[in-house]
């Protein structure tokens, strides 16, 4: 039996998006620069030669720069840890051979780090696409289960183009042999 047509697995990137790498790096650089300039204003000499702090009075400017620097470093650390732990990353698997749908995501470290939803394929009634345009556009593919429960499948972040979401939803509905709703 050919198992390549019986299993469909879609990888979900989660927090390891390019934008998260960008913002974590910018916040790390900016936060550490603010903190160094604030500390330099307190100590009275430049800790780093290319970040002069001679004209900055510690109270209030230097103190505020230290505060903003610490906030930037805390947010940057949070972003780097979510990237390291791959929070939100995982996969959507539809296995006709076993007759199950598995949705797996990584969470934050702890007791419930591994988040997994498993249900029989026969419980899937339809694939639904939600398109919301405007200031905050949302294009999401849902699996509708018996009992009108809906499980989102698409990743958070940049919305997919209309053609991409149409193609993904149609391929998934064709693979599962269920109806496609919501266009």
From Swiss-Prot:
Q: Which GO terms describe its biological process?
A: photosynthesis
The record's InterPro entries line, in alphabetical order, gives:
PSI_Ycf4_assembly (IPR003359)
Q: How would you describe this protein's topology in the membrane?
A: Multi-pass membrane protein
Q: Where in the cell is it found?
A: Plastid, Chloroplast thylakoid membrane
Q: Which UniProt keywords apply?
A: Chloroplast, Membrane, Photosynthesis, Plastid, Thylakoid, Transmembrane, Transmembrane helix
List cellular component terms (GO).
chloroplast thylakoid membrane; photosystem I
Pfam families per the UniProt record, alphabetical: Ycf4
- The lineage's top-level taxon is Eukaryota
Q: Which chain regions cross the lipid bilayer?
A: 21-43, 58-80
| Protein task | Seems to be required for the assembly of the photosystem I complex.
- Family from the record: Belongs to the Ycf4 family.
Query: PANTHER family, alphabetically?
Result: PHOTOSYSTEM I ASSEMBLY PROTEIN YCF4, PTHR33288
| HAMAP family reported in the protein's UniProt record | Ycf4
Q: What is this protein called?
A: Photosystem I assembly protein Ycf4
Q: Which organism is it from?
A: Nephroselmis olivacea (Green alga)
């Amino acid at each position: 039996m050919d198992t390549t047509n019986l299993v469909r697995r879609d990888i979900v990137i989660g927090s390891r998006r390019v934008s998260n790498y960008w913002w974590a790096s910018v916040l790390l650089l900016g936060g550490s620069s603010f903190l160094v300039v604030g500390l330099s204003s307190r100590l009275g000499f430049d800790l780093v030669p290319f970040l002069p702090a001679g004209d900055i009075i510690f109270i209030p400017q230097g103190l505020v720069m230290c505060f903003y620097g610490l906030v930037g470093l805390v947010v940057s650390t949070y972003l780097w840890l979510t990237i390291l732990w791959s929070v939100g990353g995982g996969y959507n698997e539809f296995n006709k051979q076993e007759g199950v749908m598995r949705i797996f995501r990584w969470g934050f470290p702890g007791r419930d780090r591994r988040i997994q939803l498993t249900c029989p394929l026969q419980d899937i009634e339809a694939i639904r696409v939600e398109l919301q345009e405007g200031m905050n556009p949302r294009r999401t593919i849902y699996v509708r289960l018996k009992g009108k429960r809906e499980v989102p499948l698409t990743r958070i972040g940049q919305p997919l183009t209309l053609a991409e979401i149409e193609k993904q939803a149609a391929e998934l509905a064709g693979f599962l042999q269920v109806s496609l709703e919501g266009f």
